[in-house]
Amino acid sequence: MTTSPGTVESTTPVSGQLRTVLSAGERPARATAVSATLTHLWRAMMAFKHFPVQLIDIVLMPLIFLLMFTYLFGGAFADSTEEYLQFYLPGVTVQAVVMMTVYTGTSLNTDIHKGVFDRFRTLPFWQPATLAGSLLGDVLRYVVALATTVFLGLLLGFRADGGFLGVVGAMLVLIVFGFSVSWIFAALGVVASEPERVSGTSMIVLYPLLFMSNIFVMPETMPGWMQAIVDANPMSHAATASRELMHGTAGFWDVGLVLCVSAGLVAVFAPLTMRLYRNKNAH
């Protein structure tokens, strides 16, 4: 069956009519920096829905360390496992948050190598929102890790003399600290050649910092040269701030120092990460 030329002409839109149809509706406004960041924050949070196995790592890692060190080594590190739990639980919360920051770098690097960021680059929104939203989404990891660790500690007999406000205050300080550290691994995630490089390099950096701190044992049991490293280690001050807040003996020094270090890390690594990201996009 053939179509007559007249029918074709009557159903073929002319350019003027097409332009009128396309311009009739009002175009949506360009996304603001805040709305774009919130959109990518939502995308990061949806990763837990589509990849729930991440929650297993987030929950199990700090719980395994808490149980292992408390009941295997607690009696050797302190007079009893109960006494060591009072010392170690605020420290393991630091470890839980810092270890979660590695996910920031690996997830960013995975998105880059899958071409997700290339697709984002073609869209008309504030490009740094991709990084900012991802890092803010990782805050959920910190909250889950902290909440489950503290909850198990309370079940095991941990006594938070600082009360509810002390525990919440410690968690807030550690969330700020973790957010600042995550910018370091975000920068690494942008420049690394593959996700495995990010995780491998992160472990090489983190494990010495975690174990050469006062998270696991008191510095007085260490050699003098190591005590100097422990005293200068930001992880130690974060652990001390967490202990002071949870036990109700908080002073301004360690809490203030952790917040100042966090602000310094963001001031240095946030612009650096953004610049590396823009340079990568330019190529």
From Swiss-Prot:
Pfam families registered for this protein in UniProt: ABC2_membrane (PF01061)
Any one cellular-component term (Gene Ontology): ATP-binding cassette (ABC) transporter complex
ABC transmembrane type-2 domain ranges (all copies): 53-280
Subcellular localization, as worded in the UniProt entry: Cell membrane
InterPro entries associated with the record: ABC2_TM (IPR013525), ABC2_TM_bact-type (IPR047817), ABC_2_transport (IPR000412), T7SS_ABC-Transporter (IPR051328)
TM regions (residue ranges): 58-78, 85-105, 150-170, 171-191, 198-218, 252-272
GO molecular function list: ABC-type transporter activity
Keywords on record: Antibiotic resistance, Cell membrane, Membrane, Transmembrane, Transmembrane helix
Annotated GO biological process: response to antibiotic
Membrane topology per record: Multi-pass membrane protein
Result of knocking out the encoding gene: Deletion of the drrA1-drrB1 operon decreases by 31% the daunorubicin (DNR) titer in cell culture. The drrA1-drrB1 mutant exhibits no growth defect compared with the wild-type strain and no significant change on DNR sensitivity. Deletion of the drrA1-drrB1, drrA2-drrB2 and drrA3-drrB3 operons almost blocks DNR production in cell culture, suggesting that disruption of these operons impairs the efflux of DNR, resulting in intracellular accumulation.
Superkingdom to which the source organism belongs: Bacteria
Subunit note: The complex is probably composed of two ATP-binding proteins (DrrA1) and two transmembrane proteins (DrrB1).
Purpose of the protein: Part of the ABC transporter complex DrrA1B1 involved in daunorubicin efflux. Responsible for the translocation of the substrate across the membrane. Confers self-resistance to daunorubicin, an antibiotic produced by S.coeruleorubidus.
PANTHER family in UniProt: DOXORUBICIN RESISTANCE ABC TRANSPORTER PERMEASE PROTEIN DRRB (PTHR43077:SF8), TRANSPORT PERMEASE YVFS-RELATED (PTHR43077)
Protein family per UniProt: Belongs to the ABC-2 integral membrane protein family.
The protein, known as: Daunorubicin resistance ABC transporter permease protein DrrB1
Organism: Streptomyces coeruleorubidus
